[in-house]
Amino acid sequence: MKIQIKKIVGVLLACAGIMTSTSCADFEEINKNPYLPDKDMEQKDGVLNGAYMPNLEKHIIPVPLKTDNTDLTNAYQISINLCGDSWIGYFSPRDNKWNEASNTTTFFFSEGWVNLMYEYAITNIFAPWIQLKNINMSGENPNKEMYAIAQISKIMGLHRSTDKFGPIPYKQVGNGSFTVEYDSQESVYRSFFEELDEAVTVLYDFYMKANNTVPMASDVVYEGDVTKWIRLANSLMLRLAIRVRYADEVLARTYAEKAIKNPIGVMESIDDMAKMNRGANLQTKHPMYQIADPGQYNDSRMGATIQCYMKGYADPRISKYFQDQG
């Protein structure tokens, strides 16, 4: 009797083991949606790049789509229009109505505005960049070209941030840590130069192999044109080199010469302009239209400084930049 029971239990356990191993083996396959791409397909087809790259690019300078709400326009107004634009005299508030004139235009920094500047200048750049880094650099066959474009885009957004805030979290971002140390502005700038240099090298090598474009759907600025990305990166490298010329003359000269001597060169034509491209099936609207339009925010007017320069030099662009309201 005992022998029979043992045999029955043994058979049952064996069957259970077979069922378990079979169900475990098939579980992932059974739960796949046959109508959606899996991760391997998404990486091969550039689906994920097409999701995150445009999101990164539209936050370099906050540029809303026509279908967006006013969040990006408000971010642009607080972090750019009522900040640097006002300080250098390009624009001036029509009515300094915010917080009884105690705001950035009068060099008063409220916590709410500063936090918003930080969020849109740093958090919204790093979030899609981290995804792009993981997508393009974590497999056996990394997509170095797309990552190079992501690097250039990241630096385009963040060089303004370190100029505003000084030290920022940078070198350790994206490494999976819950807390990230702040890097000095000098350290951040040195990383900028190194990363731009590497990005240009990657894209130039790609170009020399007779490859002039990356997937267009993933890039709403240059629609995948590698040579234009190289010119933008070199121009950005030159800009940053000029900014550090008094802090580190040798560093500035090194990277200024790298930018100028690159065979592709720097931006010299309006065709090289970096902008959200309408040809990428996107309808964008510049925040200044909404900020200055009398029928919308009606908050901004020409600044005295730029008026003096443009009138003094009889600059013909003045009628394109500004309209006389009478």
Label the predicted regions:
Residues C24-G89, M137:
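Membrane-proximal, proline-rich intrinsically disordered regions
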Residues M1-K32:
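Bacterial Sec-dependent N-terminal signal peptides
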Residues Q43-V47, P93-G326:
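Structured, solvent-exposed acidic/aromatic patches
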